[in-house]
């Protein structure tokens, strides 16, 4: 029994020493990396091509709250063997950063339709109805030559008077009046007539509030109003409506697809209403979103982290996509 106790104590001591050695080895990784890294001053701009944790001056992970979002542009001021030092003084692993072309090459069809629900589970509703492909700027420009547009911009036919728009419909007249902010409603709202879509028998109105904006269809027969988060693009075969753009406040894109069931009465069925977590289309820009004769919807887009440039303006450096309705 005596020898057994001595043997057990020896094993216990050895195990403790082994655990302490492993713990010390883990703690020394960052220190060893710091000692090995020799930084050379450089000036370059790279993009985060793999979401990675931010590291401090000792190369230790700052925590989950600190991370480089996919696609973010970072200014590099020094380069070592394993890490880059950024302009703001933290560090990123070199294999987590690349140039613009490297970032673009990572944007696959699968990534563009990837969607995660609120619980973090895969959601295939976008992939079920839509195919999204990255294209070149040249292909986008060529498709623009064959743009199909069903909107008639007869903005002078309905003029606002004393802050009120009047829409004569067959069954009744619809009034939309601007709402100034006040004690009960701190957000003002204004309306602007955009035009009409004869193919759908609808007026189109833009609603602009301080905390959101939307587009409204007004049925020319019934006066019924149908609201969309973004501009409703009518497909070339007149069977579907797509809306795509960036959420007003959230750092994510949005995309919706409606199937037109009937025009008189106007009835649509919502098929897709999802957020694209890491990319968004530019829906307010000189480069338009449009349907082309081939039935595809074309748009310029960007990763959310690179949507705006350093001046907080729409980033001219962007990518292009085409969307097919299945």
What are these regions (language model features)?
Residues 24-43, 60-103:
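SH3/SH3-like beta-barrel superfamily modules
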Residues 157-159, 194-200, 231-243, 288-297:
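Blade-terminus and WD-like Trp-Asp/Gly-His loop motifs, strongest in beta-propeller folds
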Residues 239-308:
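Short aromatic loop motif centered on NTY/YTY
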Residues 14-15:
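C-terminal motif of bacterial Sec signal peptides marking the signal peptidase cleavage site
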Residues 123-125, 138, 163-185, 209-227, ...:
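Surface-exposed loop/turn elements that mediate protein-protein interactions on large endomembrane-trafficking
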Residues 184-196, 226-234, 275-291:
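Conserved beta-propeller blade repeats
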Residues 2-7:
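Sec-dependent signal peptide recognition
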Residues 107-207:
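Terminal domain-start segments
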């Amino acid at each position: 029994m005596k020898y057994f106790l001595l043997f057990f104590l020896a094993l216990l001591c050895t195990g403790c020493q082994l655990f302490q050695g492993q713990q010390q080895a883990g703690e020394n990784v960052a220190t060893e990396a710091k000692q090995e890294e020799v930084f050379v001053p450089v000036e370059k701009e790279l993009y985060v091509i793999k979401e990675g944790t931010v590291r401090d001056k000792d190369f230790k992970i700052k925590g989950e709250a600190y991370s480089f979002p996919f696609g973010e542009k970072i200014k590099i001021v020094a380069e070592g063997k394993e890490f880059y030092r950024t302009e703001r003084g933290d560090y990123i692993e070199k294999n987590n950063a690349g140039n613009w072309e490297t970032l673009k090459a990572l944007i696959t069809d699968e990534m563009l339709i990837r969607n995660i629900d609120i619980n973090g589970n895969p959601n295939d509703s976008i992939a079920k109805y839509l195919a999204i492909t990255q294209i070149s700027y040249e292909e986008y420009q060529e498709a623009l030559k064959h743009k199909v547009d069903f909107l008639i911009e007869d903005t002078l036919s309905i003029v606002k008077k004393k802050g009120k728009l009047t829409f004569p419909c067959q069954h009744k007249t619809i009034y939309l009046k601007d709402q100034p902010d006040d004690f009960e409603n701190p957000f003002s709202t204004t309306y602007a007539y955009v035009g009409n879509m004869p193919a759908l028998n609808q007026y189109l109105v833009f609603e602009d509030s301080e905390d959101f904006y939307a587009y409204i269809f007004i049925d020319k027969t019934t006066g019924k109003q149908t609201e969309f988060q973004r501009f409703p693009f009518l497909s070339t075969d007149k069977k579907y409506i797509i809306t795509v753009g960036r959420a007003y406040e959230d750092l994510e894109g949005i995309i919706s697809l409606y199937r037109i069931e009937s025009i008189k009465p106007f009835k649509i069925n919502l098929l897709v209403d999802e957020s694209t977590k890491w990319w968004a289309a530019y829906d307010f820009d000189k480069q338009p979103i449009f349907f082309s004769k081939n039935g595809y919807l074309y748009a310029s887009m960007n990763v959310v982290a690179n949507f705006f440039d350093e001046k907080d303006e729409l980033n001219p450096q962007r990518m292009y996509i085409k969307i097919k309705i299945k």
